[in-house]
Amino acid sequence: IVLIFDEILVGFRLARGGAQEFFGVRADMVTYGKTLGGGLPVGVVCGRADLMRRYREDRPADICLARGTFNAHPYVMAAMKAFLDRLETQPIKALYRGLDHCWDERADRFNRRLHERGLPVRIAHLSSIWTVLYSRPSRYNWMLQFYLRAHGLALSHRGTGRLLFSLDCSDADFEAVLDRFV
């Protein structure tokens, strides 16, 4: 059985080593997306050598080639290298220190404000990945995304109620989101 982590969404939001580091589990294969390319369009599949081999043992000349217009695009490769190099710098390491505490505190503050205002919405989160949950069913819940858009906020994933924060979201930026949401 091969354990595959899909980190297209989670990427490096939880830890410098991704979800594998955060959960203390080593996957056999991992996928990454635009985070690794600094926002540029990229998809990466990596894993154990035996799973990533491009040929068959019984037919070594039968090489698998993947062709595409943007494969190994120089801008994307440079952005990926810059991202990976920066992961090793002290400012980035410092950004990850205390990350859970920071986002736990912010989620608690957000939920308190929602509760104080009597709104039927709560936030569940994993670090800076937030999901908006309704505390009671209503045929009007879908309208929240349009209200938020009118106030300059967009839920990701076509209305599934996901808020994705940048790791360097300042306290002032967070307060602005909270004020607009509530």
Q: Whereabouts are the PLM-identified features?
A:
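Conserved N-terminal phosphate-binding loop of PLP-dependent enzymes in the Aspartate aminotransferase
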Residues: 1-182
